[in-house]
Amino acid sequence: MKKFRLFLVMAILVPFLSSCSYNTMVEKREAVTGQWAQVEDSYQRRMDLIGNLVETVKGAAKHENETLTAVINARANATKVTIDPTNLTEDNIKAYQMAQNNLTEALSKLMVVHEQYPDLKVNQNFLELQAQLEGTENRISVERKKFNTMAQDYNTTISTFP
């Protein structure tokens, strides 16, 4: 009779514990997906600011067509690379990050250009956009760190699933 009770208790507990573990994995997967949306949102904000920044620089730095074209092209290429949040593979994330890095490089060249034009140094719109862009870059960094932490936690959970 004791063996039967033990078997009955195990028969009830094992599925219950398994469903709890499964639910935890689903919750963590959804958290990773949600955090990736935050990362993409931060990058989108940067894209929007860059468009405004390019328009501001166009007016003051008419001789910098090459730099402006590089930023515009990098921005266009970065918007072409998208990731389906339900398909976050390492290759997809690398391609997305490469496009974002190319945009960052082009943007840094644009920031160097502004030093050569006194009109831009005092242009209030440019200064505000530059400050917002710096804040957005910090936000991107924070959101990416959160994403990496959540992804690592999720990966640990699924690799140690009983």
Go through each PLM region and give its residues.
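A helix-centric hydrophobic-segment signal that preferentially recognizes long
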Residues: 2-162
